[in-house]
Amino acid sequence: MTIEGYKMILSFSNVLSDNINYIEANSCEEAYLKINRAKEINTNIDLAIIDYSMPIYKQENILNGSDVCKYLKKNFPNCKTIILTSILENFTLFDIVQNVSPDGIATKMDVSGDVFLKIIENVLSGNKFRSVFVVEQLEEIWENEVFINEKNRLILQYLSKGFKISEIANELSISEITIKKRITKIR
């Protein structure tokens, strides 16, 4: 669904008040700048619906929606945050939940118009929301203790991006032997 689709669903519902002001961003850089602008002009951001996969903002090291969410919460601590993602990898979902702790998270395949409104209602009521798929993936991670370790998840992420073991060792400041042992445990 697109931003316009989400806005249309909200306009036909009574979940939010009629006088909604939307701030849209299509990249991490645009989100960063709009968050800063809102802070400068003392505009509060009450709810943010963030796509995990947005073009990066290298200059500020904002690489995805998780980083946008962290930056937003740093500047607007009372803002309710929802991350929507097309990422289905369980360790990425685990990292989002553990390290970002959004108020709501769902995969895009889980989100219909009704579910979208349910997410917003839950989050605005002070509850956490996790879609069925996200919950299943988190349970799978907890069943396999090897994935709970952050270094192991980082190793898997680097491997999936094509990094060599020597490059991963440099990135994580651990020995190649340690990485090889961790990979063996993961298998």
Q: Model regions: which residues?
A:
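Acidic, metal-coordinating helix/loop segments flanking the phosphotransfer/catalytic sites
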Residues: 24-47
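Conserved phosphotransfer cores of two-component systems
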Residues: 37-41, 71-78, 100
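A short, hydrophobic beta-strand element within the central beta-sheet of small alpha/beta folds
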Residues: 68-94
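Helix-turn-helix DNA-binding segment
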Residues: 137-182
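Conserved phosphotransfer microenvironments
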Residues: 45-72
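Residues within the DNA-recognition helix of helix-turn-helix
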Residues: 119, 182-185
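Short, flexible helix-to-coil linker/hinge segments that flank and couple to helix-turn-helix
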Residues: 94-98, 102-104, 109-146
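Two-component/phosphorelay signaling modules centered on CheY-like receiver
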Residues: 1-23
